[in-house]
Amino acid sequence: MSDTKQATGAEQAERAGEAFLEAERKTIDRLLPGLDERLAGHPLEELESRESPAIEYFRESGASNILIPSEYDGVGATAVEALRVQRAIGSRAPSLAIAATMHSFSLAGLLALAAETEEKDSVEWMLLQGLAQNKLLVASGFAEGKSGQGLFAPTMRARRDGENWLLSGSKKPCSLAYSMDLMATSCAMEGDGGEFEGYAIAVVSSQLPGIEVEPFWSAPVLTGAQSECVTLRDVEIHDELMIRMGEDDGTGLDDLQTIGVVWFELLMTASYLGMASALVERVLKEGKSDANSKVQVAYEIEASMAALESVGHEIDGGRNVVELALRSVLVRYAAQDAIARAAASSVEQLGGMAFIGSRDVGYLAAATRALAFHPPPRLRSGDALLEALHGAELAVA
């Protein structure tokens, strides 16, 4: 039996249990033994603090390798399994879920490049195997935090310096700012004479001179994601660690970028479904409302998770990920609305004393709202989505 068939059988067995979050908790326990238990052993307030142990728990469990194939020493999870793990993490530690998504998003492009090579010992596969063996964390230096800018629009500039490059620029906010081992960032390349040479993804070691981390995140939620300002000043990058992307600045989508967008939308949405699930779980156990009201918030979340999993099953079945870009964005927006409804109703059903007596309820409700801030912004995406629904190529702004 192949690894894919074995994983599919395990997925079906786990989903056979109907208890809320049962499949997600079984999946994370099977793939990453001990991680969920360690997270559950801490109060939410501690896990969400700047001093949170959650990221190190994530690293130690091998969760950073979840998308890397097992033949390269990774976990080798299917897409559906990865989504369930992400929801489980979000239900325990929202900040960790955000940081984990940005790590996996950073790997998505590298995995796509590696999949295109027939050489099992290519630079891309060797790098991925090194990441897995050493449990390294990769921060994202892409333009995810900038309003109105493409997800892959270059945030930095690389200037030719002999055989290597000098990389300068900043990313804010940048999750995993203090815990990252590497950063993957988009950049515009300039030749010796300042001439434009195209765009690239640079792979940067956090130990190189010229990298500075400064406080940036001031919001009272999701502080445990370490989303601070990372500045690079003439950081020397070897040429082999500059992955060329041609002359597309990231406002359009080529296949590599599209794959990144799909994974970003799926994993980020699963993260916020996890946060909302933490509220719903409290309602099911402690809510003062009637049975119908409790069931309503549960089906809002379960229907959204089923939609996410349907895209995951397509990926696991061999569907070209590029063809799933529109669906992934539409599923994300539908889930975003369902999360807002479920969170608001959950707070009401838990009642004023639960809100007053613990910071957790208000915190989780506030955290779930942040999904609206991730790209692509819905208020500016209507025209592009409508055109895509009529058959045009999806453009993410």
Spans of model-derived segments:
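Generic structural signal for well-ordered, non-transmembrane alpha-helical segments
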Residues: 33, 274, 295-305, 309, ...
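Glycine-rich, charged/polar anion/phosphate-binding loops
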Residues: 170, 189, 214-219, 262
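Amphipathic, small/basic residue-rich leader segments at the start of a protein or domain
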Residues: 1-101, 393-397
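Glycine-rich beta->alpha junctions and the first turn(s) of the following alpha-helix
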Residues: 217-302
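DPxDG-like acidic metal-binding loop motif
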Residues: 170-208
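C-terminal helix-coil-helix/basic helical segment that borders enzyme active sites and/or dimer interfaces
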Residues: 39-46, 284-288, 303-337, 344-356
